[in-house]
UniProtKB/Swiss-Prot annotation:
Belongs to the alanine racemase family. It comes from the Bacteria. Keywords: Isomerase, Pyridoxal phosphate. This is Alanine racemase. It comes from Rhodospirillum rubrum (strain ATCC 11170 / ATH 1.1.1 / DSM 467 / LMG 4362 / NCIMB 8255 / S1). It is an enzyme of class 5 (isomerase). The lineage of its organism: Bacteria, Pseudomonadati, Pseudomonadota, Alphaproteobacteria, Rhodospirillales.
Length: 374
């Protein structure tokens, strides 16, 4: 018996859907703009070493990760014409290691720029790097004063090869937020100070703001993995994941009885409770207790009681007994149970749902509608 057979849950990842989402997002860009693939956090929890080849096959040649080790883990998958950007830049003391790789660090501060310039000078080569300017997020990036100082003294920039200038939108998922236009204007002014460099502003939601936000390179992340980039409207992206939990036990309730920790739900007489082998240790949000929904044999079934570490309980009273049985699979995410819907019920965001998908889930890569267990 293999891991998938022993496991109490199954996560199916549709690589074709990821590729289709990338193609759809690229198709929305202005002529001449390129589309990267953000594969940080192990491709949002879905497996970067599986996702990267799918994006390469679709035509993607620009990739983005957050940390050096994430980049080193997938570098061997990339052809010579691909580029891999590391958003956090080189940690202090790791500059030589990054130089020895083909990673392109994003330099976020005067200190990082100085350290990268000195490392390049020691190595005797002008290695590539990207520059991050802060236009309103207030996390990483050069402030306007730091940018002025950098351009006033060209010596550090002369020691390496800048290949990209970028910033990050703070409110792109709110199209009418005034900060969007403010950031675009600030970034356009900053990018104009680096003639000849590619410029990158838009994340997934930023792509939908319009061509003025596209510049030379867009950096979609959540949209690749099925998250809705257009809040309040129909999701234009294909769903990518299907998560199923196995029923471990079915209990018939003859008199009203409480269910789960804290006795937060009382099952009425005549109800049927199914316990599934998924919990918050697997990334299913604890806050979704008494709020989330599942699907069993095409019927909607509610989570009742609290989410515990390893278990969920569902009211399956409306499902025929021959279908609500130990070994049957309840869909927790899928084409009709989106990541965004679960995030809404758990008072969180789709990014968190995806990146917390647990290591205990065996991953099956293929079509979302394969292996339904029904």
């Amino acid at each position: 018996m293999g891991h998938e057979d022993r496991a109490t849950a199954l996560l199916t990842v549709d690589l074709d859907a990821i590729a289709d989402n990338w193609l759809a997002l690229r198709g929305r860009l202005r002529p001449g703009a390129s589309c990267a693939g953000v594969v940080k956090a192990n491709a949002y929890g879905l497996g970067a070493r599986k996702v990267v080849p799918a994006l390469l096959a679709a035509g993607c040649r620009d990739f983005v990760v957050a940390q050096i080790d994430e980049g080193l883990d997938i570098l061997d998958l990339l052809p010579a014409d691909a580029r891999l950007f590391v958003l956090s830049g080189p940690p202090e003391g790791a500059e030589d290691e990054v130089l020895d790789s083909a990673l392109i660090p994003v330099l976020n501060s005067p200190d990082q720029i100085d350290r990268w310039a000195k490392a390049c000078a020691r190595a005797g080569r002008k290695a590539p790097a990207a520059l991050h300017v802060d236009t309103g997020m207030r996390r990483l990036g050069l402030t306007p004063l730091e940018l002025d100082a950098l351009l006033a003294d060209p010596r550090p920039l002369a020691a390496f090869t800048p290949v990209l200038v970028m910033t990050h939108l703070a409110c792109a998922d709110e199209p009418d937020h005034p900060l969007n236009a403010e950031q675009r204007a600030l970034f356009a002014a900053a990018a104009a100070r680096f003639p000849g460099l590619r410029a990158s502003l838009a994340n997934t939601s930023g792509i939908f703001l319009g061509p003025e936000w596209h510049f030379d390179l867009a950096r979609p992340g959540i949209g690749l993995y099925g998250g809705n980039p257009t809040v309040g409207t129909a999701n234009p992206m294909r769903q990518v994941v299907k998560l199923q939990g196995k029923i471990l036990q079915v209990r018939r309730i003859d008199t009203p009885l409480s269910v789960g920790y804290g006795a937060t739900h009382t099952a009425p007489a005549g109800s049927t409770i199914a316990t599934v082998g998924v919990g918050y240790a697997d990334g299913f949000p604890r806050s979704a207790g008494n709020r989330a929904m599942g699907l069993l044999a095409g019927r909607s079934v509610p989570v009742v009681g609290r989410v515990s570490m390893d278990l969920l309980t569902f009211d399956v009273s409306d499902v025929p007994e021959n279908l609500a049985r130990p070994g049957a699979m309840i869909d927790l995410l899928g084409p009709d149970l989106s990541v965004d819907a679960l995030a809404d019920r758990a008072d969180t965001v789709s990014y968190e749902i995806l990146t917390r998908l647990g290591a205990r889930y065996p991953r099956r890569y293929g079509g979302v509608r394969e292996g339904s267990g029904q």
